[in-house]
């Protein structure tokens, strides 16, 4: 005889089937929800603007992201066309810079609380590292726009040529003249 207020459980066999069915259903539906969406063209355009203007990334990385810097007084930037960084590592690098290199942190609070590689300003000082100041700090969404732009137009796209140059700028420009037609 059952005691009052005792929970009623389905037999183990039915419970196992229910749990299995629920997990299988979740696995079938999850990829559709977890798939990365392609960035909106306006986000890519905003990322290009931020790369060229506010972040002034081209001064070190070159307008094409190929490491051919545009300002000789700036540190040498990486060739972003050949980088193997995934999106998360790219965003972390933009936010936190790279200690020991010329890559500055664009996150206003980088190294204030351990969010960057688990380090704080005191850790950098102790190691004799000084981070360069960025031309401007960027909001998280702005950093994501730059990543959208880089993955759409630069990373993994191979060396720049005349056709890619026109596509990059959206029209024939003076910069494209250096590439044979």
Placement of each model-derived feature along the sequence:
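Flexible coil segments in periplasmic/lumen-exposed cytochrome c-class electron-transfer proteins
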Residues: 37-45, 53-55, 63, 101-181
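Extracytoplasmic/secreted envelope proteins and their assembly/folding machinery
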Residues: 77, 87-91, 143, 147
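Bacterial N-terminal signal peptides
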Residues: 18-30
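Short, cysteine/histidine-rich loop/knuckle motifs that typically chelate Zn2+
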Residues: 59
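Short cysteine/histidine-rich zinc-coordinating motifs and their immediately flanking basic loops
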Residues: 69-76
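Glycine-rich, acidic and aromatic/proline-enriched surface loops and short helix-turn segments
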Residues: 96-100
